[in-house]
Amino acid sequence: MELVLKDAQSALTVSETTFGRDFNEALVHQVVVAYAAGARQGTRAQKTRAEVTGSGKKPWRQKGTGRARSGSIKSPIWRSGGVTFAARPQDHSQKVNKKMYRGALKSILSELVRQDRLIVVETFSVEAPKTKLLAQKLKDMALEDVLIITGELDENLFLAARNLHKVDVRDATGIDPVSLIAFDKVVMTADAVKQVEEMLA
């Protein structure tokens, strides 16, 4: 199959298996959920009655005071006591096979092509690391919410995009399923397309 280059009177021949396969919603959902789960810190922690600060002495004798019996000031029902079922640091990551991950990326890229959300250009750069230059370039292309993927990370482009809302710049090795879905449009250079094809082959 061929992808039309927007900034040149030509087309780029690409693999049907990468840019023209059926959309596997279940696979994409599984991979996106796993990717998001892997981004969770999982560092929450609370103290049990064994970990809170306090004496181990029985507050008062068992019988004869008229008060409810009590064995520790660290009891969960006491103020400043431990938590009954204390949260523990947790690893939320989910295992995803390489074949599944690549399959999900191919599904997403193919769907972007079908929805006309993927724009392929020969080159994409700015002369200087100026936000104004990139903003004007995107305005000329009628783009606002956009992910720009280049073959190699362009320093000028990266710096120019840092202060633009809903604009992100990545190199071909930095793509992920969540980012591809999150933006309205995805701009890829011809070099990036070739690199992605090789990565997902």
From Swiss-Prot:
Coiled-coil region(s): none
Record key words, sorted: Ribonucleoprotein, Ribosomal protein, RNA-binding, rRNA-binding
Entry annotated with the keyword DNA damage: no
GO MF terms, alphabetically ordered: rRNA binding; structural constituent of ribosome
SUPFAM superfamilies with a match to the protein in the record: Ribosomal protein L4 (SSF52166)
GO cellular component: ribonucleoprotein complex; ribosome
InterPro entries to which the protein is assigned, alphabetical: Ribosomal_uL4, Ribosomal_uL4-like, Ribosomal_uL4_dom_sf
GO biological process, one term: translation
Entry-linked Pfam families: Ribosomal_L4 (PF00573)
Residue numbers spanned by region Disordered: 44-71
UniProt cross-references to PANTHER family, sorted A to Z: 50S RIBOSOMAL PROTEIN L4, LARGE RIBOSOMAL SUBUNIT PROTEIN UL4M
Subunit structure: Part of the 50S ribosomal subunit.
Classification via HAMAP family: Ribosomal_uL4_B
Similarity comment: Belongs to the universal ribosomal protein uL4 family.
Known function: One of the primary rRNA binding proteins, this protein initially binds near the 5'-end of the 23S rRNA. It is important during the early stages of 50S assembly. It makes multiple contacts with different domains of the 23S rRNA in the assembled 50S subunit and ribosome.
UniProt cross-references to NCBIfam families, sorted A to Z: rplD_bact
Protein name as it appears in the record: Large ribosomal subunit protein uL4
Organism placement in taxonomy: Bacteria, Pseudomonadati, Pseudomonadota, Gammaproteobacteria, Enterobacterales
